[in-house]
């Protein structure tokens, strides 16, 4: 059995490059979601966010573990910006598949806020998943094909949330 997660945290190239390497992540693709333009493209994606769709094996990596890594590799305290990229396309967002994912997302955001690991309050949006418009082939696995390409996503050493007593998410 597999599950799906959809996350937005700035330019999708860097997000995909780091997340696809996580054990238990089976497949990723980048695209656009959360906006108003049908059949979104790189040149015409309206109010959509650049996002990554993740297919994962929940017996190998939990949804909360994906979210914790997501919060480690991008700045969730800056609205509509990651690195040099500015605008609503680069916002931080979690698009949940069901009420359980929504609950886990909201709890994880509260834990990130309480941890003090980011200097500002988390501004990550939590919204229901809608249509996901796949980006063109030139954007898929971009940093795998062009390893010297642009990214503003990096794992932050030592950045981990305190372990929860009741794991299982």
Swiss-Prot record:
Its EC number is 1.8.4.11. It catalyses: L-methionyl-[protein] + [thioredoxin]-disulfide + H2O = L-methionyl-(S)-S-oxide-[protein] + [thioredoxin]-dithiol; [thioredoxin]-disulfide + L-methionine + H2O = L-methionine (S)-S-oxide + [thioredoxin]-dithiol. InterPro entries: Met_Sox_Rdtase_MsrA_dom, Met_Sox_Rdtase_MsrA_sf. It is an enzyme of class 1 (oxidoreductase). GO terms for biological process: protein modification process. Keywords: Oxidoreductase. The active site is at 11. Gene3D superfamilies: Peptide methionine sulphoxide reductase MsrA. GO terms for molecular function: L-methionine:thioredoxin-disulfide S-oxidoreductase activity; peptide-methionine (S)-S-oxide reductase activity. It comes from the Bacteria. Has an important function as a repair enzyme for proteins that have been inactivated by oxidation. Catalyzes the reversible oxidation-reduction of methionine sulfoxide in proteins to methionine. HAMAP family: MsrA. Belongs to the MsrA Met sulfoxide reductase family. This is Peptide methionine sulfoxide reductase MsrA.
């Amino acid at each position: 059995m597999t599950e799906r997660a959809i996350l937005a945290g700035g330019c999708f190239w860097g997000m995909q490059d780091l997340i696809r390497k996580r054990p238990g992540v089976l497949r990723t693709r980048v695209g656009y979601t959360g906006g108003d333009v049908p059949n979104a493209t790189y040149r015409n994606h309206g109010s959509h966010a650049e996002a990554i769709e993740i297919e994962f094996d929940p017996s190998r990596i939990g949804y909360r573990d994906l979210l914790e890594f997501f919060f480690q590799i991008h700045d969730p305290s800056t609205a509509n910006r990651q690195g040099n990229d500015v605008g609503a396309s680069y916002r931080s967002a979690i698009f949940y598949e069901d009420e359980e994912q929504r609950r886990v997302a909201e709890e994880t955001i509260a834990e990130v806020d309480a941890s003090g690991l980011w200097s500002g309050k988390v501004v990550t949006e939590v919204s229901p998943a809608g249509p996901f418009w796949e980006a063109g082939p030139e954007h898929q696995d971009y940093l795998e094909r062009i390893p010297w390409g642009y990214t503003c996503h990096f794992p932050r050493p030592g950045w981990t949330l305190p372990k929860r007593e009741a794991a299982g998410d």
